[in-house]
Each structure stands twice: as structure tokens, then as C-alpha cells.
């Protein structure tokens, strides 16, 4: 069980899975940097930057639990407090396992693709009411490839820059990096194009 940085608990794991492991990175880069002691720290920095931007764990499907109070700014009460709209801290919610309001199980709900959960027939909810939601959220293997490729790109260029490399060629294609671009390369830093790639994964709900 892990309490994440995003206000919810991962209930089925003891450690948060990596988006991209060092072995996967070495395979994706044909072992170009294999044995470099900086790979682990660069992967960690890139992963931290990506997860901070998207606002959730961005990994394979994991069991999650999130707790709210009626006064929480991430929820909205409608129809006299008998219907709750909750912004779950996740994209790609694959299942809702259990919902309780003040200990009472609620079975009528609807989940939107952006992680907004609508819960009906909950009775009167006060500011101090406790809402507990157990759900599954995460990416399929195919969907996870974009984040893996982005991390590999970041770490590759960060390591290349630290070696003083200003141009590379592969498969007949040559790329030269501008001085300004090189100066701003960091594994944790996201460019505008990176943010476009991550847009489908970023938490953007009702609030």
C-alpha cells in the first residue's frame, strides 16, 4: 500500500512501478549508454517531471483508493446534496470497485473518461461526510509506449549533452542541436511538444 503524491492510495502494490526501467531504456537505445551510472538518476528525474505534469501515477492498471470529505474542493454537491460529482485523480479509470458515503455502500454512479465520477442516491451529504472510492486506473501496454518513448528521448539527450555531444546521426539522418536547446536540456524539463504528447494523459477534470 502506497500513499501517492496526488492524494490517493495505491492499495495493491508496495512500490510505485517505473514508467521506464533501466533495462527497457538500454534496449530502446541499443545499449548506447549501458553501464553509465547516471542513467538511474536521469530516469528518475524524467519520470518525476512527467508524473508531476500529468497529475497521477501514469502506469499500468493499478488498484486505487481515494477519500474525500463533503467540504473537499474536488467534489461538487448538487440536487440538495444528494448527488455528488467527484474528480478522481486519474485518467483512464477502468473500473469502480466500491463507493461508500458515511459507511453506506452506493451502487448508482457514472464515470466519465476524464475521471469525473457522478454518484447518485447518496442521501444528504454534509461538510464532514466521508466519501471513499475504490477504483482501478492505468494504461494498457500500448498506451504506455508514448510515455516510455518520451522518457527515453529525454534521458538520451540529457546524457548526450553531458558528454558535450552537439550533433548525432543514425540511419542516414543527422541532427544538430542548437546552443539554446542544449542549454535547456534536463530530464525533468518538458518542452511544449512533450506536453502535446502527454496531453491525452493529463488530469484535466471539472475543477
Regions found by a protein language model. Name each.
Residues 1-207:
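Divalent metal-cofactor coordination and adjacent catalytic microenvironments
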Amino acid at each position: 500500500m502506497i500513499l501517492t503524491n496526488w492524494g490517493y492510495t495505491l492499495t495493491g502494490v508496495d512500490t510505485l512501478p517505473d514508467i521506464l526501467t533501466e533495462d527497457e531504456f538500454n534496449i530502446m537505445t541499443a545499449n548506447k549508454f549501458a553501464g553509465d551510472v547516471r542513467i538511474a538518476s536521469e530516469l528518475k528525474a524524467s519520470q518525476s517531471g512527467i508524473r508531476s505534469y500529468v497529475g497521477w501515477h501514469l502506469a499500468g492498471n493499478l488498484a486505487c483508493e481515494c477519500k474525500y470529505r463533503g467540504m473537499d474542493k474536488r467534489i461538487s454537491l448538487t440536487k440538495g446534496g444528494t448527488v455528488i460529482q467527484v474528480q478522481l485523480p486519474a485518467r483512464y479509470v477502468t473500473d469502480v470497485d466500491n463507493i461508500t458515503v458515511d459507511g453506506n455502500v452506493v451502487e448508482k454512479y457514472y464515470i466519465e473518461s476524464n475521471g469525473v465520477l457522478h454518484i447518485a442516491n447518496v442521501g444528504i451529504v454534509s461538510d464532514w461526510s466521508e466519501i471513499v472510492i475504490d477504483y482501478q486506473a492505468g494504461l494498457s501496454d500500448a498506451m504506455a509506449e508514448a510515455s516510455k518513448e518520451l522518457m527515453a528521448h529525454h534521458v538520451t539527450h540529457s546524457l548526450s549533452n553531458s558528454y558535450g555531444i552537439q550533433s548525432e546521426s543514425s540511419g542516414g539522418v543527422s541532427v544538430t542541436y542548437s546552443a539554446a536547446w542544449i542549454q535547456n536540456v534536463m530530464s525533468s524539463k518538458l518542452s511544449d511538444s512533450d506536453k502535446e504528447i502527454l496531453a491525452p494523459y493529463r488530469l484535466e477534470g471539472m475543477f
